[in-house]
């Protein structure tokens, strides 16, 4: 005897099965987190003196020290007690010498999150999305969670619900306020505190460039720095784009995304074998991208944050790959308007297509000599990089005043915060 299950019932049973499996997975993950917490001390993270931390800063990777160092420097200048916590054992922050700001390694992965989930701090600053969505949970001991951007583009391009459980988000452009308010309205979220504070890492990059002086070289240096994945330039164009650049007579600098060295190792190894280092080609894997950006005349990339650093800080043209962009998993999926990034890129650069490859030399010269691109860079800079040169100081003052307001005894007057409200 055969049993028949109609499609509707089958679908329902399948949904129930998936739900049960998901519940078991999340329950198991919760047990692992608790076990990890016990194994790594089983205590709430407090300051080294044992008190509640006034200002805590968390970085999930050493690459974000360029975002936090300017802020830590400003907190140090003000004599504000703060603790910087990193999930990278080789974070440059651990070598910093401060009197008032403490830096420490709190473990990697779940070990770090287990400690953060028991954090005792008044204000917590981070650039990591996904708070209270993935392993990192809001501490049961409270705290005011503040997110700072690490790229000059749309904050709604984080994975869905990326910033939902932060109390405040520090932004770099007015358009971002409109995006986030629209997102809150669409999803029925309570309005969070949005403040225009700029981009500390880009301010620091600009100051470094000003102090570095002029760099000169012969010919054209073309930097090819794609992101990784199936829509990345190397995946879409392969060796053909490198051949085209060499045929145009340029010096080509190839800088793969760090993730490519792991996820696309076979492809990168094949390209390195086909195009070894020479007087015409160089592969660049520097941790710090400042020098390679400074000595490049033009950048070819895709939807990577480096496009805006190169264009807006170094004031140079870009060519961006015209590849697909799926908003399905992102907060941007909820919005009706086009992302700001896609309105900015056509103004500051040229959209690369396969038809451009035979004439890539002409495209490069056009981008380098057309004054319209330079004018557009100034416009885009004003749109997405406010408070230039002041960001770290503004953020430090904001954190100090926020901590004071949260801990002020009832009935006591509070000092007015910095005038950067949304």
Regions found by a protein language model. Give the residues of each.
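Donor nucleotide-activated moiety binding/catalytic core segment of transferases
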Residues: 266-308, 313
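Short, strongly hydrophobic alpha-helical membrane anchors
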Residues: 1-8
């Amino acid at each position: 005897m055969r049993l028949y299950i109609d499609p509707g019932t089958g679908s329902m049973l399948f949904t129930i099965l998936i739900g049960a499996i998901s519940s078991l997975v999340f329950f198991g993950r919760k047990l692992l987190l608790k076990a990890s917490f016990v194994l790594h001390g089983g205590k709430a993270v407090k300051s080294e003196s044992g008190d509640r931390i006034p200002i805590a800063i968390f970085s999930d990777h050493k690459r974000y020290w360029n975002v936090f160092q300017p802020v830590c420097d400003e907190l140090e200048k003000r004599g504000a007690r703060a603790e910087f916590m990193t999930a990278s054992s080789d974070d440059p922050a651990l070598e910093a010498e401060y009197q008032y700001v403490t830096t420490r390694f709190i473990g990697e992965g779940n070990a770090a999150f287990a400690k953060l989930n028991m954090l005792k701090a008044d204000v917590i600053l981070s650039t990591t999305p996904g708070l209270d969505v993935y392993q990192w949970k809001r501490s049961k001991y409270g705290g005011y969670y503040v997110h700072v951007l690490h790229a000059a583009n749309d904050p709604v391009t984080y994975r869905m619900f990326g910033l939902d459980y932060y109390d405040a988000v520090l932004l770099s452009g007015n358009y971002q306020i409109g995006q986030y308010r629209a997102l809150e309205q669409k999803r029925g979220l309570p309005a969070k505190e949005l403040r225009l504070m700029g981009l500390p890492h880009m301010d620091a990059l600009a100051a470094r460039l000003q102090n570095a002086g002029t760099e000169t070289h012969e010919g054209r240096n073309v930097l090819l720095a794609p992101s990784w994945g199936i829509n990345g330039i190397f995946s879409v164009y392969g060796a053909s784009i490198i051949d085209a650049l060499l045929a145009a007579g340029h010096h080509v600098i190839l800088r793969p995304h760090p993730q490519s060295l792991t996820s696309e190792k076979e492809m990168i190894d094949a390209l390195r074998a086909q195009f070894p280092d020479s007087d015409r080609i160089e592969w660049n894997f520097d941790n710090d991208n400042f020098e390679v950006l400074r000595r490049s005349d033009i950048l070819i990339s895709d939807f990577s944050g480096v496009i805006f650093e190169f264009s807006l800080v170094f004031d140079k043209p870009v060519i961006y790959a015209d590849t697909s962009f799926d908003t399905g998993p992102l907060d941007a999926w909820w919005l009706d308007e086009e992302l700001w990034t896609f309105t900015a890129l056509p103004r500051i650069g040229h959209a690369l297509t396969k038809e451009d490859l035979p004439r890539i030399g002409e495209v490069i010269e056009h981008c380098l000599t057309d004054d319209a691109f330079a004018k557009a860079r100034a416009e885009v800079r004003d749109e997405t990089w406010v408070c230039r040169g002041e960001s770290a100081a503004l953020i430090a003052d904001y954190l100090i005043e926020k901590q004071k307001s949260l801990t002020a005894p009832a009935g006591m007057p509070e000092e007015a915060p910095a005038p950067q409200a949304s």
